[in-house]
Swiss-Prot record:
One of its GO terms (molecular function) is structural molecule activity. It holds the Pfam family FliE. InterPro entries: FliE. This is Flagellar hook-basal body complex protein FliE. Belongs to the FliE family. The keyword Oxidoreductase does not apply. One of its GO terms (cellular component) is bacterial-type flagellum basal body. Keywords: Bacterial flagellum. Its main location: other. The keyword Cytoplasm does not apply. GO terms for biological process: bacterial-type flagellum-dependent cell motility. It is found in: Bacterial flagellum basal body.
Length: 103
């Protein structure tokens, strides 16, 4: 008799837990502008470091490192840096526009 009583309580608890799971609202992960900007800067830095490492490997004569691969990596690095600079310029211009607005 006592076991049946416990089983009933367990079933009620499991049903309550299932209802709570179904009613739980999953919040999407919050994405902040600062976080995205920092991640983009990190990717630019990683690209530059990879290109620099590739160039150093080519300079010391590591087998399997071709000049065309080095040049492509250096161009990717340069383009990503230029893109980062342009984004910064647009952000500064937008900030200046907002600061020049009259209230």
């Amino acid at each position: 008799m006592a076991i049946q009583g416990i089983e009933g309580v367990l079933q009620q608890m499991q049903a309550t837990m299932q209802v709570a799971r179904n009613n739980a609202v999953e919040t999407p992960p919050s994405v902040s502008f600062a976080g995205e900007l920092q991640a983009a800067l990190g990717r630019i830095s990683d690209t530059q470091n990879a290109a620099r490492t590739q160039a150093e490997k080519f300079a010391i004569g590591t087998p399997g490192v071709a000049l065309n691969d080095v040049m492509v990596d250096l161009q990717k690095s340069s383009i990503s840096l230029q893109m980062g600079i342009q984004v910064r310029n647009k952000l500064v211009a937008a900030y200046q526009d907002i600061m020049n607005m009259q209230v």
